[in-house]
UniProtKB/Swiss-Prot annotation:
One of its GO terms (molecular function) is rRNA binding. One of the primary rRNA binding proteins. Required for association of the 30S and 50S subunits to form the 70S ribosome, for tRNA binding and peptide bond formation. It has been suggested to have peptidyltransferase activity; this is somewhat controversial. Makes several contacts with the 16S rRNA in the 70S ribosome. This is Large ribosomal subunit protein uL2. Residues 223-274 are annotated as: Disordered.
Length: 274
């Protein structure tokens, strides 16, 4: 994997920094694991914008990624690594001994030709998936299940990982990249190692059009809107907004805690660090 800074042959190329991975598959993805991925432009069934800054972008298919890893005891061979336009991490196409192929999140250090496995008897090595009760304390893991059998929900993006720091009865305590420490059920599964493509954070898109290719539209500041559109809007000439920063719906945007799920507060040992 290489970090490539483009030559300034045009204003749009001047600031581009690309991550080039020669190991990625250059052909088409595996067709049986593709699904239609239609766009809605951030609109709901009434045609109203429910998520701002979404629209346009290149067409692409959704890759069906196996987040459950339930084919226990069946060894699999990594056939190739692929780019996935739906996420920051790369994905790996694996071929199981029974002939089935599946996509998984590509772990760091796992390459084409490597063997992986899932189940309670799997070895402690990168790419193998086990229940967390069978993973040694101190291990680095990714694709962590919050509910056993639901599939991985934590530490799935490029370069992400969590560390198992304690085991207590039916729960294990994990530390996330954000600094948050939380309890999860030890029956839940996790994959050994960390997610690959950690250089993703070093890339620079270089121009607005590169964001538009990805379906991301511009973000307009509230102080340049009209009063009907934003609490900071209006005024004669340039203004400061006239109040503490808020969202378009009046919710404070700086330092205001918005977590509402009190039911799961008991599982958070330590809140994330700023």
């Amino acid at each position: 994997m290489a970090i490539v800074k483009c030559k300034p042959t045009s204003p749009g190329r001047r600031h581009v920094v690309k991550v080039v991975n020669a190991d990625l598959h250059k052909g088409k993805p595996y067709a049986p694991l593709l699904e239609k991925n239609s766009k809605n432009g951030g609109r709901n069934n009434n045609g109203r914008i429910t998520v701002r800054h979404i629209g346009g972008g290149h067409k692409h298919h959704y890759r069906l990624v196996d987040f459950k890893r339930t084919k226990d005891g069946i060894p699999a061979k990594v056939e190739r690594l692929e780019y996935d336009p739906n996420r920051s991490a790369n994905i790996a196409l694996v071929l199981y001994a029974d002939g089935e192929r599946r996509y998984i999140i590509a772990p760091k250090g796992v390459n084409a030709g490597d063997q992986i496995q899932s189940g309670v008897d799997a070895a402690i090595k990168a790419g193998n998936t086990l229940p967390m009760r069978n993973i040694p304390v101190g291990s680095t893991v990714h694709c962590v299940e919050l509910k056993p059998g639901k599939g991985a929900q934590l530490a799935r993006s490029a370069g992400a990982y969590a560390q198992i720091i304690a085991r207590d009865g039916a729960y294990v305590t994990i530390r996330l990249r954000s600094g948050e420490m939380r309890k999860v059920l030890s029956e839940g599964r996790a994959t050994i190692g960390e997610v690959g493509n950690s250089e993703h954070m070093l890339r620079e898109l270089g121009k607005a059009g590169a964001s538009r290719w990805r379906g991301v539209r511009p973000t307009v500041r509230g102080v340049v809107m009209n009063p009907v559109d934003h609490p900071h809007g209006g005024g004669e000439g340039r203004t400061s907004g006239g109040r503490h920063p808020v969202s378009p719906w009046g919710v404070p945007t700086k330092g205001f805690k918005t977590r509402k799920n009190k039911r799961t507060d008991k599982y958070i040992v330590r809140r994330r660090t700023k």
